[in-house]
C-alpha cells in the first residue's frame, strides 16, 4: 500500500490529476509520473516582448515579497541569499534597503538577463557552507527539488542563530487550485499547511503562514483557459503595473502561501 512521503501514513490518497496525488491526512501533494516535466524557464529565449513582460512581472512580485517581509519580520539583516532568484529583482530590493544580498539561479539564460549580485549555480546539500546568513529566501522554487527536506536541512545549516527563512509556495489547500486542478509545471512536491509547523528536527520554527492570491497568476490562468478575454487580461496587467490594482491580496484560502521559519 502506497505510503505518503511526508506524513508516512498509508492508503489515504486522492487523485488530483493524471500524474498528481494528494494525501488526505497532511494535504501534501506530489507528482507520481514516471518522467517529470521540464522546469519552466524564467526568461524566454524566443520572444523579446515576452521576456520584457516577464521582467516587469518579476519586479512587481519582488516588491510584493518585500512588502510581506517588512510586515512580518524585523528586517535588520546583515546579509541574505535568494535561492532560485530568477532575474534577481528581490535581491535588488534587499540591497536597496542596505542588506548585503546575493542570489543563485540555475538557468544560464536567465542569469544572462539578470540584475547584478546574481550568480549561476545549483543549490543542494553540497552547497558551500562557509558563509552563514541572517536571511534566506526560496520563493516559488522549493517544490522543484527532488527532496525538499534535504534542502530545508541545508538552508538551516546556512542560517545564523535566529536567522529567517522566507518561502513563497503553493497552497495545497486552495479551493481555486482544487477546482481548476492547477499544478505547477516541473513541480515535484508541495507540503500541506500543517507540515510547515513540524521542522523542529531541522532547528526551524514556523513563525508565520500567510495565504494570498497572486492575481496576475490567476488572470493568466483564466486567460489561457478562455475564461478571461485577452483584452481584459492586458487591461488588468496595466492596472497592476500602475498600482491601481494589487498584485498580491492576502486572504484565507489563497492560491499561494508565504511561510516564515526561524532558526533556533
Task: Give a label for each model feature.
Residues 140-144:
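A short His-aromatic
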Residues 149-164:
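A short glycine-rich, Lys/Arg-flanked "PGG" loop and its adjoining helix->strand segment in the class I
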Residues 115, 146, 160:
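Short conserved AdoMet
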Amino acid at each position: 500500500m502506497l505510503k505518503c512521503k511526508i506524513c508516512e501514513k498509508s492508503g489515504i490518497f486522492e487523485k488530483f490529476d493524471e500524474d498528481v496525488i494528494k494525501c488526505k491526512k497532511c494535504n501534501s501533494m506530489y507528482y507520481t509520473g514516471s518522467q517529470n516535466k521540464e522546469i519552466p524557464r524564467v526568461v524566454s529565449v524566443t520572444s523579446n516582448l515576452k521576456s520584457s513582460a516577464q521582467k516587469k512581472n518579476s519586479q512587481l512580485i519582488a516588491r510584493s515579497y518585500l512588502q510581506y517581509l517588512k510586515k512580518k519580520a524585523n528586517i535588520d539583516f546583515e546579509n541574505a541569499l535568494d535561492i532560485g532568484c530568477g532575474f534577481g529583482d528581490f535581491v535588488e530590493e534587499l540591497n536597496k534597503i542596505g542588506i548585503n544580498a546575493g542570489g543563485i539561479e540555475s538557468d544560464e539564460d536567465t542569469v544572462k538577463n539578470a540584475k547584478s549580485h546574481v550568480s549561476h549555480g545549483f543549490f543542494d546539500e553540497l552547497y558551500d557552507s562557509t558563509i552563514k546568513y541572517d536571511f534566506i529566501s526560496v520563493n516559488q522554487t522549493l517544490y522543484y527539488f527532488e527532496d525538499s527536506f534535504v534542502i530545508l536541512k541545508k538552508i538551516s545549516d546556512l542560517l545564523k542563530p535566529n536567522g529567517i527563512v522566507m518561502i513563497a509556495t503553493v497552497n495545497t489547500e486552495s479551493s481555486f487550485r482544487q477546482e481548476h486542478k492547477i499544478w505547477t509545471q516541473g513541480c515535484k512536491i508541495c507540503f500541506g499547511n500543517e507540515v510547515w509547523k513540524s521542522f523542529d528536527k531541522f532547528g526551524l520554527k514556523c513563525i508565520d503562514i500567510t495565504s494570498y492570491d497572486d492575481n496576475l497568476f490567476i488572470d493568466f490562468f483564466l486567460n489561457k483557459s478562455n475564461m478571461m478575454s485577452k483584452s481584459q487580461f492586458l487591461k488588468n496587467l496595466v492596472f497592476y503595473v500602475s498600482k491601481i490594482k494589487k498584485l498580491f491580496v492576502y486572504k484565507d484560502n489563497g492560491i499561494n502561501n508565504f511561510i516564515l521559519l526561524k532558526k533556533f
